[in-house]
């Protein structure tokens, strides 16, 4: 639990994204082992298939909760030390590390069942027909301007959509039963840790298999994490951490963005609530029934939508004592690389987005983030009254994206993505690339007087190439003061008070979570580009180019 923290799960996909709100807005900064990590997973769109563009998964899905030692939340002026991007707060995650002692091996595993929370109750066939008749009659009276919607009396010529015989001899199909199901979760965790006075190590591995509660939903995840700390000399130590994970998802249609297509490209859950209960599952010829332009909920089970993600990150830290335990310097390098491939195929016998047509999309994405920091720290207890801690540092942060994809139409169902060159329809190729760079200088000083009165000040200067020239840099100051009331003599005798502190702070934070295409770029439109005849090029205005 954390005061002021709100979480909302906005996807029923396994590993679905959790929106975290700390300061009234979403997307806080996540700092894992001192390195800022992406909070959102890389995502791909559905191309020209009509499927949702994003399946909403967490950027930290590759971090095993069993490897986490502690979590700290910064939500006031203390977040200003992280400067631009910290307007929505900061979440500090400290992974477990090895400790001096004999090797320790631990294992835990679990198997659990998952059931859907009681869902919306849809109308049965008789209720549906009765309400359809009521609505149809009211609509008739309104259009004819008959009572009570006009001066004319009812003419008695309205005929019900469903007769009494229809209502008494109708079948009843509960479409939710074709979409919702029970699931399960299997977890296995294994850790090994230990060390000596010179070397400490931690290794952790996990396996997770989850079957979702919506048709076609599921995932398999493998994670491996390790770190090692080495004291090379009394004045020099080195730590290294690494994490690798692989995730394989089966994506389900659960009601996300439909690309402004409305119910013609709605989810299986949406269709299950909209589909009339009096319709059977299949028609006389064995094909799925269709209702207007809404996809058959059960038919969506034949849509194949798979995602595979690979991620690994490396962190290196060197700490050198320049003068006793008073003055030291630290260097940090962190790298996180993610790759993802998503493949979609809609068979020709599935009516979706107002058509019977085989369609597919293959898309790959890659993201690389790098962190490089150098810090000088000072720590000393002076005059037997004041503990002084100060830090000054510089940082450079790089982020790059690259992706490509192709949508295709009219390929044989048995071939699907295995040979898209055999497709008889149109092809829609896409590609993109982007790079961002941020540079920072930061300073922090703290004074703890008599272990009762604390004063802290920070100053950070951030610059990013996301903004126009002349507006790339900004300062982010903060100051805070605290009174540890529980350390005063008049409260020490009260045993039921462990910590009582009064704190006030002021600070300035920023936001750069604005994407990488804020102004002009080369941007061909895949609907208009024709490689054999012509193309369209948008040239940015010269004064708006990035440096």
Give the predicted meaning of each segment.
Residues 36, 122-123, 127-176, 268-299, ...:
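Flexible glycine-rich, low-complexity coil/linker segments exposed to the extracellular/periplasmic environment
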Residues 1-44, 69-70, 75, 79-96:
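Extracytoplasmic beta-strand/coil segments of soluble accessory domains associated
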Residues 81-83, 101-102, 115-118, 248-251, ...:
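Switch/connector loops and helix/strand junctions flanking conserved nucleotide-binding motifs
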Residues 221, 227-236, 241-246, 254-255, ...:
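Extracellular/periplasmic, surface-exposed regions of secreted and cell-surface proteins
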Residues 3, 14, 18, 28, ...:
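Residues embedded in well-ordered regular secondary structure
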Residues 62, 67, 74-92, 216-229, ...:
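Conserved, well-structured beta-alpha core segment at the onset of a catalytic domain
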Residues 37, 207-211, 460-465:
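A short, flexible beta-alpha/helix-coil linker loop
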Residues 52-62, 222, 356-363:
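Aromatic/His-enriched, Gly/Pro-containing loop or helix-boundary segments
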């Amino acid at each position: 639990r954390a005061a002021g923290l709100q979480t909302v799960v906005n996807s029923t996909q396994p590993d679905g994204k959790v929106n975290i709100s700390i300061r009234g807005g979403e997307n806080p900064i996540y700092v894992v082992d001192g390195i800022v990590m992406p909070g959102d997973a890389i995502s791909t769109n559905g191309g020209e298939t009509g499927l949702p563009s994003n399946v909403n998964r967490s950027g930290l899905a590759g971090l095993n909760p069993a490897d986490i030692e502690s979590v700290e939340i910064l939500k006031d002026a203390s977040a200003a030390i992280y400067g631009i991007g910290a307007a929505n707060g900061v979440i500090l995650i400290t992974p477990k590390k090895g400790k001096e002692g004999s090797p320790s091996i631990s294992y835990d595993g679990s198997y659990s069942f998952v059931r859907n929370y009681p869902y919306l109750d849809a109308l049965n066939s008789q209720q549906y027909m009765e309400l359809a008749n009521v609505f149809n009659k009211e609509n008739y009276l309104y259009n004819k301007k008959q009572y009570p919607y006009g001066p004319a009396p009812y003419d008695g010529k309205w005929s019900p959509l469903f007769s009494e015989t229809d209502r008494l001899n109708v079948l009843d199909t509960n479409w939710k039963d074709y979409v919702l199901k029970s699931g399960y979760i299997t977890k296995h965790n294994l850790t090994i840790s230990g060390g000596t006075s010179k070397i400490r190590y931690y290794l952790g591995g996990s396996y997770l298999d989850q079957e979702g509660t919506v048709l076609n939903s599921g995932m398999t995840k493998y994670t491996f994490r390790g770190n090692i700390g080495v004291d090379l000399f009394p004045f020099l130590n080195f730590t290294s951490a690494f994490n690798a994970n692989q995730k394989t998802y089966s994506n389900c249609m659960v009601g996300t963005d439909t690309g402004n297509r409305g119910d013609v490209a709605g989810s299986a859950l949406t269709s299950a609530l909209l589909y009339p209960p009096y319709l059977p599952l299949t028609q006389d010829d064995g094909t799925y029934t269709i209702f207007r332009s809404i996809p058959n909920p059960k038919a969506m089970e034949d849509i194949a939508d798979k995602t595979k993600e690979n991620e690994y990150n490396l962190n290196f830290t060197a700490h050198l004592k320049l003068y006793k335990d008073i003055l030291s310097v630290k260097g940090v390098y962190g790298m996180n690389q993610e790759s993802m491939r998503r493949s979609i195929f809609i068979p020709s016998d599935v009516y979706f987005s107002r058509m019977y047509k085989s369609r597919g999309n293959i898309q790959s994405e890659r993201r690389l983030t790098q962190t490089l920091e150098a810090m000088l720290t000072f720590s000393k207890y002076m005059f037997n009254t004041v503990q002084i801690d100060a830090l000054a540092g510089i940082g450079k942060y790089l982020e790059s994206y690259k992706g490509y994809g192709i949508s295709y139409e009219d390929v044989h169902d048995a071939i699907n993505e295995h040979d898209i060159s055999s497709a008889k329809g149109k092809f829609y190729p896409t590609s993109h690339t982007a790079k961002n760079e941020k540079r920072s200088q930061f300073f922090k000083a703290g004074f703890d007087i008599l272990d009762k009165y604390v004063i802290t000040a920070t100053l950070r200067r951030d610059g990013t190439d996301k903004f126009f020239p002349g507006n790339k840099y900004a300062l982010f100051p903060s100051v805070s003061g605290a009174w540890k009331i529980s350390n005063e003599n008049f409260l020490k005798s009260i045993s039921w008070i462990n910590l009582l502190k009064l704190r006030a702070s002021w600070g300035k934070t920023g936001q750069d979570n604005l994407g990488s295409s804020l102004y002009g770029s080369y941007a061909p439109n895949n609907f208009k580009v024709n490689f054999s005849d012509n193309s369209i090029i948008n040239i940015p205005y010269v004064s708006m180019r990035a440096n």
